[in-house]
């Protein structure tokens, strides 16, 4: 199982898809990745359709002061030039699914190819997606072209909801053979490190 610090970062020079059916675990995760990367001095661009203050508030779970290397660009809309806005070492596009809803498969392929080209030159992309928003063929295209795919899952177990992270694939990393249990606290998203018995 990955160590706690390993899932808080994505590999450099990569395009990584973070997806979830319904919920906010992916948001907690991307806020943590952005805050930690900016805290390490990386230039982070967070391109979003959500209010910038909501994004910054989410990141404050992980750092008291948001570094100057973090730029939140809100008001993004479908059809915007996503690649043109994505400068810096790490670009987070939230929500990639809603911002790409009007793209046909050729446009989507062109956009993802451009991201991969930029990634090979040193930039990383984190694409945040709500499953089921894009047509199934488009969702599968994004998964196929991404260097990594992380999926968040919530399951009902008895009278509780258990949250998990699945790393479906990640360039340069051996396949993970376990799902990673998570908890959400006042401090944000945390790996549940308690060993399960039985």
Would you name each region that the model predicts?
Residues 12-79:
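Conserved P-loop
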Residues 83-145, 149:
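P-loop NTPase motor core
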Residues 193-198:
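Short, charged, intrinsically disordered terminal tails
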Residues 1-9:
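Pre-Walker A adenine-sensing motif
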Residues 16, 44, 125, 149-151:
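Short, well-ordered beta-strand core segments
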Residues 133-188:
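Phosphate-binding/switch region of NTP-binding enzymes
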Residues 1-2, 75, 129-133:
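Short gly/ser/thr-rich secondary-structure transition/capping motifs
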Residues 36-40, 58-65, 99-102, 115-118, ...:
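Conserved, well-folded catalytic cores of nucleic-acid-processing
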């Amino acid at each position: 199982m990955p160590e706690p610090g390993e899932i808080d970062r994505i590999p450099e020079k990569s395009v990584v898809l973070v997806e979830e059916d319904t919920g906010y675990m992916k948001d907690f995760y991307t806020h943590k990745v952005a805050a930690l990367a900016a805290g390490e001095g990386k230039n982070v661009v967070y391109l979003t359709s959500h209010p910038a203050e909501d994004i910054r508030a989410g990141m404050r779970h992980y750092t008291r002061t948001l570094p100057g290397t973090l730029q939140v660009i809100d008001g993004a809309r479908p059809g915007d030039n996503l690649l043109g806005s994505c400068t810096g070492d790490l670009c987070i596009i939230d929500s990639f699914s809603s911002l790409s809803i009007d793209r046909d498969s050729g446009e989507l392929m062109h956009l993802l190819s451009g991201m991969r080209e930029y990634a090979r030159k040193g930039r990383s992309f984190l694409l945040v997606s709500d499953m089921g928003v894009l047509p199934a063929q488009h969702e599968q295209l994004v998964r196929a072209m991404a260097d990594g795919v992380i999926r968040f899952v919530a399951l009902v177990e008895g009278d509780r909801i258990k949250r998990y992270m699945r790393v479906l694939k990640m360039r340069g990393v051996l396949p993970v053979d376990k799902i990673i249990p998570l908890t959400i606290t006042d401090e944000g998203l945390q790996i549940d490190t308690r060993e399960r018995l039985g």
